Regions:
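Residue-level preference for alpha-helix termini and adjacent loops
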Residues: 10, 31-33, 66
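N-terminal edge beta-strand
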Residues: 15-43
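Bulky hydrophobic/aromatic "packing anchor" residues in well-ordered structure
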Residues: 21-23, 60, 105
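Histidine- and aromatic-enriched segments that form or immediately flank copper-ligand environments
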Residues: 52-75
């Protein structure tokens, strides 16, 4: 998570059926972060990204292209992904990627 100034270690959410990540949290010189930036989950966990309406339009795009949300600015919008296989999934916001708007899901 280079260039991601709100990264504060991996938040352990193993055992949870659903985990919420805020889109547009304060980071990287504005509302250009995911909070938490890195989470650890169990296989079968659904991650729900929820937009807070700050920092203009954001999206959630997997580095390997397996999922991509639409570009949205509205507060309360959600995008979900269920992780069925173990591994590390890196994702980012397309317009703010170079600013450090990136995240990681570690699936165990």
């Amino acid at each position: 998570l280079s260039n991601t100034n709100n990264y504060d270690g991996v938040v352990d959410e193993t055992g949870a059926a659903e985990v919420t990540v805020t889109v547009g949290s304060e980071a990287n010189g504005g509302n250009f972060g995911f909070d938490p930036a890195a989470i650890r989950v169990s296989t079968g966990t659904t991650v729900v990204w929820e937009w807070n309406g700050l920092g203009s339009s954001h999206n959630v795009v997997d580095e390997d292209g397996s999922f991509e949300s639409e570009l949205v600015a509205e507060e309360g919008h959600t995008f979900s992904q269920t992780f069925e296989e173990s591994g590390t999934v890196e994702y980012y916001c397309t317009p703010h990627r170079t600013m450090g708007m990136k995240g990681v899901v570690v699936v165990e």
